[in-house]
Swiss-Prot record:
The modification Phosphotyrosine is found at residue 500. SUPFAM superfamilies: BAR/IMD domain-like, Protein kinase-like (PK-like), SH2 domain. GO terms for molecular function: ATP binding; non-membrane spanning protein tyrosine kinase activity. CDD domains: SH2_Fps_family (cd10361). Pfam families: FCH, PK_Tyr_Ser-Thr, SH2. Residues 348-609 form the Protein kinase domain. The F-BAR domain is truncated and contains only the FCH region (the coiled-coil region is missing). The keyword ATP-binding applies. Its EC number is 2.7.10.2. Coiled coil: none annotated. It comes from Feline sarcoma virus (strain Gardner-Arnstein) (Ga-FeSV). The active site is at 470 (proton acceptor). This is Tyrosine-protein kinase transforming protein Fes.
Length: 609
């Protein structure tokens, strides 16, 4: 922006959130352009190399000039053509190598620098905003304190002035009443007493408030005791950046769109997976339809007129009821807001890697807003869309649950890649490692309390018709106060009738923890979770030993089918082992419910010293 004196500088508008949003949009657009340039150059290098190879191959096919002699004009022409073809091949190959080692390489470095610059800019802006807010609040509190002190002093001075004014008025009235005459004669005692009482009456009469005093008093009652700040200048919704729009769902997997769109004309905007494109998804005639929002010359359009931003485009389509395309005739009706659980990537500060899952790394972190400690599960960007949808299945399950023995969901980051699931950070680590490192020092009552926690969490899931399918010590977490929480809901499913029929092979199935009917027929239920809970009990009281240690998965299946079961751990109470055996009943209907298991464990714990 240009200053009034003609020099160039930054406009004050860039200091506002709107300016920050515009700056971020510009950075995103530049990065998308650079990525497009890099892809174009890489394709050019590839094409030039392939073309050079084909030309070289053609130049080697010199069969046409054989037998004509070296002095034949045709032979000489053919030799010249093949020579020039070989020269062109070398030139193209050299050009491709120069492009690859020069501009393409430097462009890659530039992209990384711009990405780092964008990250640094965002972090610095957040830090400045926090410092500004903190300083602003401190200044306001200081001014408030000064104002209150001045208000008290003013009120006290006003009261003193009013009292002095009343005394002055009374004295003046008394003097006027006495007049300029001689002093009165000496009175008798009775007259003096009467005079005194008359004087008191006069003084009492002097205290009667006048109409003006009453008005002043009443106005003081209704006068506001504080000043209000001036109203803020609100930013119209259409001028807010894309990531602040309620209908922008970020990198939402395509598979989840159908669940959010329920009525004809419902729509949302999302980022295309694997491509730097935005997609407008609309429900029409009972089917979700997906339109790529074209971007050219910094204008956005599905077809026809272009707009400077996607919010302006969406606002126009909603207001005008203009069809998205002439061919489709689809009209936008209702924007579907993003989930309340959605967080921005900028809301997180990532820490060190603390683990690795099936979908990607797990990091520690904090929420910028209040420094809450969190665990951040990431999903690798290279995974196919259907796998990314499975990654979000865990968050979809946990959104509905709240229990002290179920790990708590904080939110999901789907606004851009990579996708994150944000959960409470349980700092004690997983239960299996805890048993192997701390188990020997734990009292029996503590172990009973911890498996009781697991039973309480599973009883809650059972009441919600949720089947965990992967219950094991490795998938439970321990707090610093030895409270156990059920975690890892990646394989969990909800079933209205309490039974889930799985399809596919056993590649991902934990065979040694899984009930026979689930392995044989793919039939999962709370009863199959009870079988897994029996294995969890065995892991607990064997202090983290591996079940069926000398058997393969196939041998374990055959052993269980023949009636074989795990032996009683050395330090396990008899009552707990009897409960394990009940959990391992071959028929699902003969296994106890989690409610009964919880009650039995509570009873055993009370009896145990």
């Amino acid at each position: 922006a240009a200053r009034a004196d003609g020099t160039m500088g930054f406009s004050s508008e860039l200091c506002s959130p709107q300016g920050h949003g515009a700056e971020q949009q510009m950075q995103e657009a530049e990065l998308r352009l650079l990525e497009g340039m890099r892809k174009w150059m890489a394709q050019r290098v590839k094409s030039d190399r392939e073309y050079a190879g084909l030309l070289h191959h053609m130049s080697l096919q010199d069969g046409g000039g054989r037998g004509t002699g070296p002095y034949s004009p045709i032979s000489q022409s053919w030799a010249e053509i093949t020579s020039q073809t070989e020269g062109l091949s070398r030139l193209l190959r050299q050009h491709a190598e120069d492009l690859n080692s020069g501009p393409l390489s430097k462009l890659g470095l530039l992209i990384r620098e711009r990405q780092q610059l964008r990250k640094t800019y965002s972090e610095q802006w957040q830090q400045l905003q926090q410092e500004l807010t903190k300083t602003h609040n401190q200044d306001i509190e200081k001014l408030k304190s000064q104002y209150r002190a001045l208000a008290r002093d003013s009120a006290q001075a006003r009261r003193k002035y009013q009292e002095a004014s009343k005394d002055k008025d009374r004295d003046k009235a008394k003097l006027e009443q006495l007049g300029p005459g001689e002093p009165p004669p000496v009175l008798l005692l009775q007259d003096d007493r009467h005079s005194t009482s008359s004087s008191e009456q006069e003084r009492e009469g002097g205290r009667t408030p006048t109409l003006e005093i009453l008005k002043s008093h009443i106005s003081g009652i209704f006068r506001p005791k504080f000043s209000l700040p001036p109203p803020l200048q609100l930013v119209p919704e259409v001028q807010k950046p894309l990531h602040e729009q309620l209908w922008y769902h970020g990198a939402l997997p395509r598979a989840e769109v159908a669940e959010l769109l329920t009525h004809s004309g419902d729509f949302l905007v999302r980022e295309s997976q694997g491509k730097q494109e935005y997609v407008l998804s609309v429900l029409w005639d009972g089917q979700p339809r997906h339109f790529i929002i074209q971007s050219a010359d910094n204008l956005y359009r599905p077809e026809g007129d272009g707009f400077a931003s996607i919010p302006l485009l969406v606002d126009h389509l909603l207001r005008s009821q203009q069809p998205l395309t002439k061919k489709s005739g689809i009209v936008l009706n209702r924007a579907v807001p993003k989930d309340k659980w959605v967080l921005n990537h900028e809301d997180l500060v990532l820490g060190e890697q603390i683990g690795r899952g099936n979908f990607g790394e797990v990091f520690s972190g904090r929420l910028r807003a209040d420094n809450t400690l969190v665990a951040v599960k990431s999903c690798r960007e290279t995974l196919p869309p259907d796998i990314k949808a499975k990654f979000l299945q865990e968050a979809k399950i946990l959104k509905q649950y709240s229990h002290p023995n179920i790990v708590r969901l904080i939110g999901v980051c789907t606004q851009k890649q990579p996708i994150y699931i944000v959960m409470e950070l349980v700092q004690g680590g997983d239960f299996l490692t805890f048993l192997r490192t701390e188990g020997a020092r734990l009292r029996m009552k503590t172990l009973l309390q911890m498996v009781g926690d697991a039973a309480a969490g599973m009883e809650y899931l059972e009441s919600k018709c949720c089947i965990h399918r992967d219950l094991a010590a490795r998938n439970c977490l321990v707090t610093e106060k030895n409270v156990l929480k059920i975690s890892d809901f990646g394989m969990s499913r909800e079933a209205a009738d309490g039974i889930y029929a799985a399809s596919g092979g056993l590649r991902q199935v934990p065979v040694k923890w899984t009930a026979p009917e689930a392995l044989n027929y793919g039939r999962y239920s709370s009863e199959s979770d009870v079988w897994s809970f029996g294995i969890l009990l065995w892991e607990t009281f064997s202090l983290g030993a591996s079940p069926y240690p000398n058997l393969s998965n196939q041998q374990t299946r055959e052993f269980v089918e023949k009636g074989g079961r795990l032996p009683c751990p050395e330090l396990c109470p008899d009552a707990v082992f009897r409960l394990m055996e009940q959990c391992w009943a071959y028929e699902p209907g003969q296994r106890p419910s989690f409610s009964a298991i919880y009650q039995e464990l509570q009873s055993i714990r009370k009896r145990h010293r």
